[in-house]
């Protein structure tokens, strides 16, 4: 391991204090685009809601959800153009449904897939037991008389969307050319619509949802309570879960709404949590994706990193300055890239980086370069040009970042404080945290001696 003695924690080097305006200039440039982005989103959403209202008029089993304002909030935060999910509620009495978890789910696959059975003793569910969305059970001993079939529900919803779009265009309820349904195809778990709003095009994925009371154990964990406003986890848990199509026969728990509520809760706390997320999302779009939005980190990846960073750094002073806030997310992100594992925030056994198409080695190099020398990515105007500063880290940092892969106990505040100090942004005066961080240094120093 690099280093032979623990230096005094670096509060702020003089040249870093000079950099602070650079971070704020970059943030202000992002924020200047927020209002137009929100207006574009609201226009696009209005077009989509007009279509969905017609869907409901054609088939009252499908309900327009007007209660969700979190997508607009997130759309304003980010610079990336990832598709947005829009949920269409199934107006079924969810208490009359039984979640039958599949035994075939592999460990680490995240939320279990399940079937949704209609209980035999349930009454008033005749609209949900028609052949277009329902499959009769062949087993007499089952508690259920049959199941809601995702592929059938999606097929009905797709046909309704097509009919609704035709109606809205014919009656001029939506602007000409504002909605493209070319990707609305059979067999998809999400129904994709491209909506034009001014010069911006926003892709929405329409998803049928069954909302049901169901425990999410992670929301009851003591660790999460440290980083969030008091009582918020209990209120979020009371919402229940959203079940969305996983495949033709099975549903799965969607955590999108729960995670968005957690992100929104962070925005109510003082500090730069959401500002730093906006900065990293912009840097990701401009510098880390290598010109492609299809095979890089997504806003959801970065959102998960912030949620973990908020539990690892729960103190208000961790988020008091903008640069330090960015680096609290960066050290978590770098660790996840180095170990090739980003745990799902509510289902930590599920690795969000295991999906195909991500060149984690290349992404790591870009993120590490930014963390070591962020200036070139932050300069947005010729007046921001200045002399290049030396790298903040040495070549041995990747070995340190991989420690949690072999010893999960490193996934703790003291370890990440140690990494912050390596990047010269540990600006905490708490004696207990300094002592714990120095203990981590001594531990890594001992490991380095044993391996040499």
Swiss-Prot record:
Pfam entry (one): Mab-21_C
This protein's species is Mus musculus
Please name the gene that encodes this protein.
Answer: Mab21l4
Task: Output the SMART domains linked to this UniProt entry.
Answer: Mab-21 (SM01265)
User: Under which name does UniProt file this protein?
Assistant: Protein mab-21-like 4
């Amino acid at each position: 391991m690099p280093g032979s003695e623990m230096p005094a924690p670096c509060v702020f080097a003089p040249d870093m204090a000079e950099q602070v305006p650079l971070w704020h200039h970059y943030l202000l440039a992002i924020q200047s685009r927020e209002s137009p982005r929100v207006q574009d989103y609201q226009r696009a959403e209005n077009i989509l809601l007009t279509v969905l209202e017609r869907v409901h008029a054609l088939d009252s089993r499908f309900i327009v959800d007007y209660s969700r304002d979190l997508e607009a909030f997130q759309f304003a935060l980010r610079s990336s153009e990832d598709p947005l999910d829009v949920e269409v509620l199934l107006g079924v009495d969810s208490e009359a449904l039984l979640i039958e978890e599949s035994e075939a789910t592999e460990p680490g696959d995240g939320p279990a897939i399940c079937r949704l059975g209609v209980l035999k003793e349930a009454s008033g569910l005749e609209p949900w037991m028609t052949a277009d969305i329902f499959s009769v059970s062949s087993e007499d001993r089952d508690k259920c008389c049959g199941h809601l079939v995702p592929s059938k529900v999606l097929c009905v919803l797709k046909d309704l969307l097509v009919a609704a779009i035709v109606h809205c265009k014919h009656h001029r309820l939506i602007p000409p050319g504002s909605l493209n349904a070319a990707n609305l195809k059979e067999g998809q778990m999400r129904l994709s619509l491209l909506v034009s709003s001014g010069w911006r095009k926003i892709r929405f994925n329409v998803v049928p949802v069954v909302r049901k009371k169901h425990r999410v154990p992670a929301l009851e964990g003591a660790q999460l309570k440290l980083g969030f406003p008091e009582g918020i986890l209990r209120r979020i848990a009371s919402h229940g879960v959203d079940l969305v199509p996983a495949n033709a026969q099975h549903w799965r728990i969607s955590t999108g709404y729960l995670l968005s509520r957690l992100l929104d809760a962070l925005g109510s706390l003082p500090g730069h949590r959401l500002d730093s997320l906006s900065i990293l999302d912009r840097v990701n779009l401009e510098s880390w994706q290598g010109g492609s939005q299809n095979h890089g980190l997504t806003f959801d990846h970065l959102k998960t990193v912030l949620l973990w960073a908020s539990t690892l750094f729960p103190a208000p002073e961790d988020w008091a300055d903008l640069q330090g806030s960015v680096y609290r997310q960066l050290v978590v992100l770098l660790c996840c890239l180095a170990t090739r594992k980003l745990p799902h925030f509510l289902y930590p056994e599920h690795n969000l980086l295991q999906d195909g198409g991500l060149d984690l080695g290349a992404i790591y190099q870009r993120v590490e370069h930014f963390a070591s020398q962020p200036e070139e990515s932050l300069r947005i105007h010729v007046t921001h040009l200045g002399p290049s500063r030396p790298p903040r880290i040495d070549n041995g940092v990747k070995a340190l970042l991989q420690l949690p892969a072999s010893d999960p106990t490193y996934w703790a505040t003291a370890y990440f404080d140690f990494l912050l100090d390596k990047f010269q942004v540990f600006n905490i005066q708490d004696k207990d945290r300094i002592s714990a961080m120095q203990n981590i240094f001594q531990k890594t120093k001992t490991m380095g001696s044993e391996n040499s």
